[in-house]
């Protein structure tokens, strides 16, 4: 995900205001605070600034929520995703003026108008919308100009203080950034306040390493990118004590007073003691430590020195080989199968991109035939093939085989991920749905309950994903009771339910990404 860390050389402002360059290049004063119950900014050594809690937090607690400073839908999904709440829609309502923005309905369109009106005019004038980075920087600047002089008791930092890492970018990346800057000036209306090139470049650098990817309402696909300044103060750890989820908000209530904005929520994964630093993971944990360090250095320009990286915790599991009665495959065999797996994963992705799912299944089966005698159950190469095989077979409605792979995947993930990791919860949920479709009701219910126990912590009871899961949990519980009473009646009712397809399809992710 495009999400990064704040770096200001370990300094913390001593007052509640920061003198900074405004977008016109003149000195301005932006008011911020050092504390926002229950968090405060502190000097986190070589990591720069950080956030810590001022009181004890428990698993599932929302440490803080933050509406986006600005956010945009990805170019590739601009016709399918609401530009206000970021929900996917089959028949969205189009803005009649710019003909670019789409919304769930007029309620969402009205809610977004304050953000969209200047964008709408700019798009109409040039005849087309620029790329998402340009649109996001423009929205940020319009927001800055609109909010000049305002003071917020929930603003812990300013965009001016966020690190852009321009000095650390490669020549190729800087060249791309300059192209975006030029596209910005072609887009920026002459009637808007002039903006200096240095400041525009700074903002492009900021979103490059601090942009947060926004998912759809079911968490199945990244659909946009936004900037959340307070969240940028939360430093990285590969084994964090918090997770970040997107709450799409509520614009559907008849009474507008019950409407809520799209926002991120920083949630505690377990007990966090008073004074303890808040951390999240910027990258997926399912990479060996040296690969995570490389990714973090490449995207966020820092060397990770967390305990899991410095000690290589769980690297042995991620590279595990099969041990049969004390006998392990030779290093040459392991290398050969590893090389084969890397090549197979490339072929799988190519076939998947082309929508050739039967070819994906064929390659997965061939890969597993070679991997199973050599790799242990937690080996990352094996798990990646199992994940893809389960997902694609579910899409092809070959649920029994898919369920077997899904169970093996979950068994491996459970030994690797943090017990309250959101990705683990989502994987278990998908495995549960796959088992339900396969008619394995007892296993399905157990998996669904396990997923619910995780997602109630990571997402909360009112998130759309958790609500969906609660419906599935209730249904599988009812079916399990019926199954134990009379299997014949259960099978008959199950066929009736399947014909209406009330439950989320286990292979839905493929439909949304292909």
Predicted segments with their positions:
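Short alpha-helical interaction motifs and adjacent low-complexity tails used for partner binding
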Residues: 2-514
């Amino acid at each position: 995900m495009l999400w990064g860390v704040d770096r200001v050389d370990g300094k913390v402002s001593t007052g509640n205001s920061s003198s900074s360059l405004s977008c016109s290049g003149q000195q301005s004063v932006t008011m911020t605070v050092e504390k926002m119950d229950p968090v405060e900014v502190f000097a986190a050594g070589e990591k720069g600034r950080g956030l810590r809690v001022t009181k004890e937090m428990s698993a599932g607690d929302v440490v803080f929520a933050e509406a986006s400073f600005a956010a945009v839908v990805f170019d590739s999904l601009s016709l399918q995703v609401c530009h206000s709440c970021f929900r996917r829609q089959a028949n969205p309502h189009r803005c009649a003026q710019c003909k670019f923005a789409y919304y769930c309905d007029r309620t969402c369109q009205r809610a977004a108008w304050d953000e969209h009106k200047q964008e709408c005019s700019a798009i109409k004038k040039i005849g087309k919308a620029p790329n998402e980075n340009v649109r996001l920087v423009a929205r940020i600047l319009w927001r800055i100009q609109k909010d000049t002089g305002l003071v917020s008791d929930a603003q812990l930092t300013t965009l001016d203080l966020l690190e852009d890492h321009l000095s650390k970018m490669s020549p190729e990346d800087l060249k791309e950034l300059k192209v975006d800057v030029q596209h910005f000036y072609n887009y920026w209306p002459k009637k808007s306040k002039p903006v200096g090139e240095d400041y525009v470049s700074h903002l492009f650098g900021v979103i490059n390493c601090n942009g947060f990817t926004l998912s759809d309402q079911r968490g199945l696909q990244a659909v946009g990118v936004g900037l959340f300044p307070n969240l940028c103060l939360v430093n990285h750890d590969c084994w964090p004590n918090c997770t970040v989820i997107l709450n799409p908000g509520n614009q559907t209530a008849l009474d507008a007073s019950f409407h809520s904005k799209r926002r991120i929520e920083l949630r505690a994964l377990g007990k966090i003691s008073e004074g303890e630093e808040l951390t999240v993971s910027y990258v997926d944990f399912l990479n060996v430590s040296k690969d995570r360090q490389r990714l973090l250095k490449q995207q966020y320009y820092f060397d990770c020195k967390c305990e899991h990286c410095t000690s290589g915790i769980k690297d042995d599991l991620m590279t595990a080989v099969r041990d049969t009665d004390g006998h392990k495959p030779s290093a040459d065999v392991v290398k050969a199968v590893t090389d084969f797996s890397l090549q197979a994963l490339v072929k799988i992705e190519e076939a998947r991109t082309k929508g050739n799912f039967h070819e994906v299944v064929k390659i997965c089966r061939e890969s597993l035939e070679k991997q199973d005698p050599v790799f242990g159950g937690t080996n990352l190469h094996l798990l990646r093939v199992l994940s893809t095989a389960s997902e694609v077979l579910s899409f092809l409605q070959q649920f029994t085989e898919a369920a077997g792979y899904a169970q093996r995947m979950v068994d491996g993930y459970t030994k690797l991920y943090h017990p309250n990791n959101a990705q683990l919860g989502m994987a278990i949920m998908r495995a549960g749905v796959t088992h339900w479709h396969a008619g394995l009701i007892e296993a399905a219910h157990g998996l669904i309950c396990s997923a619910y126990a995780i997602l109630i912590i990571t997402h909360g009871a009112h998130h759309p994903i958790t609500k969906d899961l609660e419906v599935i949990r209730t249904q599988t519980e009812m079916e399990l009771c019926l199954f134990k009473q009379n299997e014949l009646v259960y099978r008959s009712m199950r066929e009736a339910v399947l014909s209406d397809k009330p439950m989320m399809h286990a292979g839905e992710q493929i439909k949304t990404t292909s």
